[in-house]
């Protein structure tokens, strides 16, 4: 016990956790770039965001946003345009969630509910079908860019 807390009364034990994040839907475009039309972006070079500050939550998601921002930055510098991932992919669906309009934006991990759903998927194998569709979308995206 911490001596200074010896007389403290605890209503509930727990932990404190705080996320620092921006309102990504308001400030970032589909590539996690600061929207150039915003006043705060007028006098600075193009700026991309990644990690927890975007409202993604989790280590894997932090890596995904870092890769995604770097990929789109490179595409913009080298080719003059960005190259987002398909919405059917896990990373693409998370990125869409980070930048789509949302009045009560809060950090989120990836989950299968972010992927586009189609009628008729049975609960029994729904995640498996969505995962296969996500993998296929990424493979097609890679093949279309001759990166395989």
Question: Which ranges hold each PLM region?
Answer:
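A glycine-rich dinucleotide-binding beta-alpha-beta segment and adjacent secondary-structure elements
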Residues: 1-56, 63-65, 83-99, 105-111, ...
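Glycine- and aromatic-enriched mobile tails/lids
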Residues: 53, 72-148
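An active-site-proximal "capping" alpha-helix that borders the catalytic cofactor pocket
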Residues: 61-76
